[in-house]
Amino acid sequence: MAGSEQQRPRRRDDGDSDAAAAAAAPLQDAELALAGINMLLNNGFRESDQLFKQYRNHSPLMSFGASFVSFLNAMMTFEEEKMQLACDDLKTTEKLCESEEAGVIETIKNKIKKNVDVRKSAPSMVDRLQRQIIIADCQVYLAVLSFVKQELSAYIKGGWILRKAWKIYNKCYLDINALQELYQKKLTEESLTSDAANDNHIVAEGVSEESLNRLKGAVSFGYGLFHLCISMVPPNLLKIINLLGFPGDRLQGLSSLMYASESKDMKAPLATLALLWYHTVVRPFFALDGSDNKAGLDEAKEILLKKEAAYPNSSLFMFFKGRIQRLECQINSALTSFHTALELAVDQREIQHVCLYEIGWCSMIELNFKDAFDSFERLKNESRWSQCYYAYLTAVCQGATGDVDGAQIVFKEVQKLFKRKNNQIEQFSVKKAERFRKQTPTKALCVLASIEVLYLWKALPNCSFPNLQRMSQACHEVDDSSVVGLKYLLLGAIHKCLGNSEDAVQYFQRAVKDELCRQNNLYVQPYACYELGCLLLDKPETVGRGRALLLQAKEDFSGYDFENRLHVRIHAALASLRELVPQ
């Protein structure tokens, strides 16, 4: 049986739903699975779930589709029961795929060397590769569910699961490449006899070019994500990564995801979303392109332009349109897009929350603290992800509007909502809220705190010049010795965005020298070192000093807020420097 080649019978009870329409024709599994994922991305979450559940026992591919929807539901809600259900579903799919494997996985080359009847073995070859890719996909999602628990044993377990998945991806990727090469060789070697071709090459009635291309797309999604994610791991974790035998080639990762996104596999739309996520969220947040805050926008816009016709009602694609507009500093347009995405996601609470989060951030970028407060307060009350963090943002924005008494009440809630003890964001939120829990905050300090989170989340480059100047004025108005170092760090970052490099250098130097921040804001000095180092890299005569400051930020400080986040940025800055000036 070749799971990817089976056909579905016509349904008798068509109904009016999209799921019924998709299932009415005798589609192949691969086409049906792709239709289900497309349905999901066009806000047909229920219809997609219904389609996959109806056919989940017909083939491994449809079983995986049902398990993926279950996994997505768990990751969007973080509800314990849904996470357990997703684990059970993924394990069921994994067992289904293993049921006919018999524990023996021969390489394609061995099959050909043994001179087996390719016409007979080709369908099982396709089926086996499909099953192996699905097993690896299931293992990756099981590892993610394990990591969410944030326990040491879960991290170790997740790491070994990922190692198994990577080995399968790598082997399948090489096998499929070998099959494609053999197929091309067969097409070009016209001098071979018909019998010889049948003995040694992939024939048309065996493995079709279309099947090979779809399989390559299927494996390229996981293969590419591995490369891309591992390429961003900070140096302090590389030893563990190398021990597990993972790769990390950024360009290979992007190339594989592009291939997957253009394929006819069910994960093609997911590869598209992964690319949009990388270009509009990861690249700017981790400063993977140094001070070039608009790197990746052209690629993201091209992807959206190519795909928007296929997803006219997709809240997720509208969300990424808003992300692009925000990065281009078109905040009003971004707000319109996020509000549209919010309306499109009427039945998808978790996607609504992602949109609300962006609306809150865009409002903060505009210094519209009232609207920001409304968004974050709703998230605090509705979201299950991190009420502690949302409570902190709510309190900061409430205080920045001038309602300092109301803000103090919410600051007191932050500690009570602190649940994820190993989460850096929640640790930061609790630490920052502690001061205002004991004494009434001032409006000036709350405005400073809002600028601080804009800086830490790399949102200052999205601000307009007039708003940056207002922020600079707000920083100067703060007269509190306990936040002097923080004030200088923020002023340096603001002037850097305004293009005033000389002023920025002076402020960063003052922040580096401020010893009081070691008591109150431990992260200020290493972050100031990093910022100063990046500025000095821009001039040939100060490159050496800039590199020394980056190494100082990396090696001389530890135990501060968002340490791993800074290490990723330092790693990216040093890597780009090596590209320009080979060591």
Curated annotation (Swiss-Prot):
Organism, as annotated: Homo sapiens (Human)
SUPFAM superfamilies: TPR-like
UniProt record, GO biological process: cilium assembly; otolith morphogenesis
Top-level taxon of origin: Eukaryota
Gene that produces this protein: TTC39C
InterPro entries associated with the record: Iml2/TPR_39 (IPR019412), TPR-like_helical_dom_sf (IPR011990)
Name of protein: Tetratricopeptide repeat protein 39C
Signal sequence segment: none
The keyword Phosphoprotein belongs to this UniProt entry's keyword annotation: no
